[in-house]
């Protein structure tokens, strides 16, 4: 009986010492990515901001190259919600966009550092910054409403790229 008491007491002390050693580290270290221009408030001084290079418009690529790049970037987002939303949007609208609209779409999907921002703006959960309030954002918001009640469970297959125009 005395041996089991010693082991349970020492186990408890070890667990408490681990907790007291790790809990300050866990409570201080947290990561958050900020939208460009945001900075941590006084209460967020312990957060780490990961600086990203500023977005720059690519002026040296052809329209077809830009369309292909934007199609790829619309499909490979890193979060499923935007992969589905943006890839289906790209399938429906990318081929018909003007050069100006392609540039606006490029800025929209590549300038924000947080993909959730794009999703919240498209679904109107949060207001978009003034710089992104344009005709492409209006198209994306309208598309996100899914007025035709289409089933959107995955990104589209790429066969449509090889179909001949009708």
Curated annotation (Swiss-Prot):
Cellular component aspect of the GO annotation: cytosol; mitochondrial matrix; mitochondrion; nucleolus
GO biological-process terms attached to the record: mitochondrial electron transport, succinate to ubiquinone; mitochondrial respiratory chain complex II assembly; negative regulation of canonical Wnt signaling pathway; negative regulation of epithelial to mesenchymal transition; protein dephosphorylation; protein-FAD linkage; tricarboxylic acid cycle
Extent of the transit peptide: 1-29
Main location: mitochondrion
Cell location: Mitochondrion matrix
One Pfam family named in its UniProt record: Sdh5
Keywords, sorted A to Z: Chaperone, Disease variant, Mitochondrion, Transit peptide
Keyword Cytoplasm recorded: no
InterPro entries recorded: SDH (IPR005631), SDH_sf (IPR036714), SDHAF2 (IPR028882)
Keyword Acyltransferase appears in the UniProt entry: no
Lineage: superkingdom: Eukaryota
Function: Plays an essential role in the assembly of succinate dehydrogenase (SDH), an enzyme complex (also referred to as respiratory complex II) that is a component of both the tricarboxylic acid (TCA) cycle and the mitochondrial electron transport chain, and which couples the oxidation of succinate to fumarate with the reduction of ubiquinone (coenzyme Q) to ubiquinol. Required for flavinylation (covalent attachment of FAD) of the flavoprotein subunit SDHA of the SDH catalytic dimer.
Assembly behavior: Interacts with SDHA within the SDH catalytic dimer.
Clinical disorder: Pheochromocytoma/paraganglioma syndrome 2: A form of pheochromocytoma/paraganglioma syndrome, a tumor predisposition syndrome characterized by the development of neuroendocrine tumors, usually in adulthood. Pheochromocytomas are catecholamine-producing tumors that arise from chromaffin cells in the adrenal medulla. Paragangliomas develop from sympathetic paraganglia in the thorax, abdomen, and pelvis, as well as from parasympathetic paraganglia in the head and neck. PPGL2 inheritance is autosomal dominant.
Family designation: Belongs to the SDHAF2 family.
Protein name, per record: Succinate dehydrogenase assembly factor 2, mitochondrial
Protein species of origin: Homo sapiens
């Amino acid at each position: 009986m005395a041996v089991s008491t010693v082991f349970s007491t020492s186990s408890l002390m070890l667990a408490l010492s681990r907790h007291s050693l790790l809990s300050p580290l866990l409570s201080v270290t947290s990561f958050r990515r900020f939208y460009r221009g945001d900075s941590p408030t006084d209460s967020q001084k312990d957060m780490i901001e990961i600086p990203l290079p500023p977005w720059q418009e690519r002026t040296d690529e052809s329209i077809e190259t830009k369309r292909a790049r934007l199609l790829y970037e619309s499909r490979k987002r890193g979060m499923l919600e935007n992969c589905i939303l943006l890839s289906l949007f790209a399938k429906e609208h990318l081929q018909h966009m003007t050069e100006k609209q392609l540039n606006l779409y490029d800025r929209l999907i590549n300038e924000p550092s947080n993909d959730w921002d794009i999703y919240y703006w498209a679904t109107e959960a949060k207001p978009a910054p003034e710089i992104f309030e344009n005709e492409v954002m209006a198209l994306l918001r309208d598309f996100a409403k899914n007025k035709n009640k289409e089933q959107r469970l995955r990104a589209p297959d790429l066969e449509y790229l090889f179909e001949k125009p009708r």
